[in-house]
């Protein structure tokens, strides 16, 4: 028995089905089936834990409020105590490219509410929930707050955000860095052929908008993959290379390459899978208009695919005589190492 049988003969999901929610940037349901019995619970639990604990994000680390020495103060003309303001600041959702720490400021006069949308951001910081109310000002009141923003993972308590040389008036804030807000999963029975006891894993993921749910799951899976590599203590035996006759084709053999081997974003790859576009030969025959009619497929994904095809000397809207060949799966396997 070859060692490869330990993993090669296990059933694997045909594809990951992604169903976006009302806001595709924040909500999605992902389904993987069929899985070996017990794998639904194993993978669902592992992915959920990593999603909630280990993805990088941005959050407010501390705040300085003009005229305030500590968080147990009150501010003239401001209806909320500083403690309540700090709790509201903790709920600010941010997206930031690059590394921190960075600064952002809010300055406003009353009367009226001060919201996260009033914050003056710099560089690559984006406030994802601008309607979040931070405090309420009476007529004639004024407030100025300066925030320190940083990147990290998981949850960091305010005490850990206080530097040893913190100046008077610096108020540390609990930081929720994780871009993932909620994750739930369920495991159901599913069938494959005549076998009824395989697993179907359904995951529901909600993010703060800094990352899409499908990308979040992809990153979590990559983290698990990287952590598990240390347990693999062997190298797979190399396949024996046999000389075979390669038939002449009426089309570019690169068309036999599967689209899931292209370096595409998770969203673009899933759109192609959901539209049953398996091979590059299927893809290049599509026009731009046809691609844009694909559900959840936008201009950004279109430009990404056009760029990848251009690097191969290909483009959309090509005519491919003799496509698809009758024995496409066999041909694709034979040409796998030749392009």
UniProtKB/Swiss-Prot annotation:
It comes from the Bacteria. Belongs to the RNA polymerase alpha chain family. The gene is rpoA. This is DNA-directed RNA polymerase subunit alpha. It catalyses: RNA(n) + a ribonucleoside 5'-triphosphate = RNA(n+1) + diphosphate. One of its GO terms (biological process) is DNA-templated transcription. Keywords: DNA-directed RNA polymerase, Nucleotidyltransferase, Transcription, Transferase. HAMAP family: RNApol_bact_RpoA. SUPFAM superfamilies: C-terminal domain of RNA polymerase alpha subunit, Insert subdomain of RNA polymerase alpha subunit, RBP11-like subunits of RNA polymerase. GO terms for cellular component: cytoplasm; DNA-directed RNA polymerase complex. One of its GO terms (molecular function) is DNA binding. Pfam families: RNA_pol_A_bac, RNA_pol_A_CTD, RNA_pol_L. SMART domains: RPOLD (SM00662). Gene3D superfamilies: 5' to 3' exonuclease, C-terminal subdomain, DNA-directed RNA polymerase, insert domain, RNA polymerase, RBP11-like subunit. Homodimer. The RNAP catalytic core consists of 2 alpha, 1 beta, 1 beta' and 1 omega subunit. When a sigma factor is associated with the core the holoenzyme is formed, which can initiate transcription. The N-terminal domain is essential for RNAP assembly and basal transcription, whereas the C-terminal domain is involved in interaction with transcriptional regulators and with upstream promoter elements. Residues 251-339 are annotated as: Alpha C-terminal domain (alpha-CTD).
């Amino acid at each position: 028995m070859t060692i490869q049988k330990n993993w090669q003969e296990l059933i694997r999901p045909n594809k990951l089905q992604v169903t976006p929610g009302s806001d595709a940037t924040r909500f999605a349901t992902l389904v993987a089936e069929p899985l070996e019995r017990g794998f639904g619970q194993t993978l669902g639990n592992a992915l959920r834990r990593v999603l909630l604990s280990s993805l990088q994000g941005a959050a407010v680390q501390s705040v300085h409020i003009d005229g305030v020495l500590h968080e147990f103060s009150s501010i003239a003309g401001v209806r909320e105590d500083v403690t309540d303001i700090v709790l509201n600041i903790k709920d600010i959702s941010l997206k930031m490219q690059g590394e921190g720490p960075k600064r952002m400021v809010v300055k406003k006069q009353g009367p009226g509410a001060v919201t996260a949308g009033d914050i003056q951001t710099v560089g690559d910081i984006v406030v994802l929930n601008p309607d979040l109310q931070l405090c309420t000002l009476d007529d004639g009141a004024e407030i100025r707050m300066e925030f320190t923003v940083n990147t990290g993972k998981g949850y960091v308590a305010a005490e850990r955000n206080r530097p040893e040389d913190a100046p008077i008036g610096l108020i540390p804030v609990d930081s929720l860095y994780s871009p993932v807000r909620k994750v739930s999963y369920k495991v159901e029975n599913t069938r494959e052929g005549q076998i009824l006891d395989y697993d179907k894993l359904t995951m529901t993921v909600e993010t703060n908008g800094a990352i899409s749910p499908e990308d979040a799951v992809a990153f979590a899976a990559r983290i698990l993959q990287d952590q598990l590599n240390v347990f693999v203590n062997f190298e797979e035996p190399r396949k024996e290379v046999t000389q075979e006759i390669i038939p002449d084709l009426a089309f570019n053999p690169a068309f036999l390459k599967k689209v899931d081997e292209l370096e595409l974003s998770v969203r673009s790859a899933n759109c192609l899978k959901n539209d049953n576009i398996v091979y590059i030969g299927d893809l290049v025959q599509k026009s731009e208009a046809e691609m844009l009619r694909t559900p959840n497929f936008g201009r950004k994904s279109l430009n990404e695919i056009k760029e990848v095809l251009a690097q191969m000397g290909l483009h959309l809207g090509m005519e491919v005589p003799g496509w698809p060949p009758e024995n496409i799966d066999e041909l694709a396997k034979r040409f796998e190492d030749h392009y």
